[in-house]
């Protein structure tokens, strides 16, 4: 019997499960608290869940970000329950979320994440494009996906996340 995976926007009923997914995937509560804070402050561009036969097993969130005066989006957190990792669920969440961000017209997506995971979706080290991070993080974990080449042609400088992210770093 094949299990049915559904990628969809979060609903209010999903909030406890989203907290649980983030807490278990990261082994701490900061990411779940970040998601709650972004949601409470109206700073969620997109929040998707991956539901396996109705059970939420994964979550991804996009929030506003900026580089200079250019507005874009920040991916994160993205989490999958440990028992369901390495099955392509995270990849499906990233693909669906990035497609939505592109269709919505956001010119870039930044991410702080695993340097062996995100490049397969087109993310590159942001420093190669003259873009730096708000925080002191290793160069290879701060990445950028250019969605609109024309809007990003002469953009460089400091990428800014929402203030809510300061509680996580």
Segment roles from a protein language model:
Residues 103-107, 112-138:
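Conserved active-site alpha-helix within GNAT-family acetyltransferase domains
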Residues 80, 86-99, 111:
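Conserved acetyl-CoA-binding loop-helix of GNAT-fold acetyltransferases
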Residues 49, 55-65, 71-79:
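Conserved beta-strand in the GNAT
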Residues 1-34, 42-57, 142, 148-169:
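Short amphipathic alpha-helix that is part of the acyltransferase structural core
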Residues 86-87, 91, 137-148:
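Accessory recognition modules or surfaces
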Residues 35-39, 129-132:
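Short, solvent-exposed loop/turn elements at beta->coil junctions and helix N-caps
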């Amino acid at each position: 019997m094949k299990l049915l995976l559904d990628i969809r926007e979060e609903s209010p009923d999903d909030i406890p499960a989203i907290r649980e997914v983030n807490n278990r995937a990261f082994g701490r509560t900061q990411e779940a608290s970040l998601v709650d804070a972004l949601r409470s402050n109206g700073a969620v561009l997109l929040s998707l869940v991956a539901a396996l036969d109705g059970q939420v097993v994964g979550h991804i969130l996009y929030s506003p970000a900026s580089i200079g005066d250019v507005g874009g989006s920040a991916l994160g957190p993205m989490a999958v329950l440990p028992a369901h990792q390495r099955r392509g669920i995270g990849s499906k969440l990233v693909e669906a979320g990035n497609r939505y961000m592109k269709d919505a017209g956001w010119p870039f997506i930044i991410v702080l994440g695993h340097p062996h995971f995100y490049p397969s979706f087109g993310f590159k080290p942001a420093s190669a494009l003259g873009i730096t991070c708000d925080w002191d993080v290793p160069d290879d974990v701060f990445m950028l996906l250019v969605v609109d080449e024309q809007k990003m042609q002469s953009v460089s400088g400091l990428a800014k996340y929402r203030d809510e992210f300061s509680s996580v770093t």
